[in-house]
């Protein structure tokens, strides 16, 4: 049986010690598990509290706890790299999603200007 897992499960596996760690490890033996990019986004947000070395952590966790398909996996991996390069977690996931889908991003955020994603300015024009 395949079950969807959320961030508590990922945190239990990622932390050195967690009250759910044993249960999470047992669940890996008992079930096929799957999660989404949202859980990995939440893990990146929790990173500051737990001080994870998140780039290798996420790559390793994706092997244990995959997302639905290869496209979503690419979003997560690219987002973690963008975050590592200084983007906010949310902008990193937006940029990774746009890049993976081969889309431009309509935004006022200048952070997109230095990456693989083409930014279509949302900024007001002189006429407005």
Regions from the PLM with identified roles:
Residues 88-104:
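Acidic, metal-associated active-site segment
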Residues 41-44, 80:
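Amphipathic alpha-helical segments within well-ordered protein domains
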Residues 62-84:
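Acidic catalytic patch
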Residues 10, 40, 112-113:
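A generic structural signal for short hydrophobic patches within well-formed alpha-helices
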Residues 5-6, 34-37, 87-88, 109, ...:
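Histidine- and aromatic-rich ligand-binding microenvironments
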Residues 38, 70-74, 93:
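Short beta->alpha linker loops
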Residues 1-35, 47-57:
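Short, well-structured N-terminal submotif of metal-dependent ribonuclease cores
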Residues 2, 68-69, 99-128:
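Acidic, PIN/NYN-like endoribonuclease modules and their adjacent C-terminal/linker elements
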């Amino acid at each position: 049986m395949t079950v969807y897992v959320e961030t508590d499960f990922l945190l239990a596996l990622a932390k050195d010690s967690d009250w759910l760690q044993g249960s999470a490890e047992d669940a890996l033996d008992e079930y096929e598990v799957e999660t989404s990019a949202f859980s990995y986004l939440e893990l990146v947000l929790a990173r500051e509290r737990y001080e994870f070395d998140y780039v290798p952590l996420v790559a390793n966790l994706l092997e244990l706890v995959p997302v639905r398909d290869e496209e979503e996996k690419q979003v997560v991996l690219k987002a973690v790299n963008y975050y590592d390069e200084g983007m906010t977690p949310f902008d990193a996931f937006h940029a990774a999603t746009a890049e993976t889908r081969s889309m431009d991003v309509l935004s006022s955020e200048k952070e997109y200007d230095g990456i693989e994603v083409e930014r279509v300015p949302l900024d007001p024009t002189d006429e407005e």
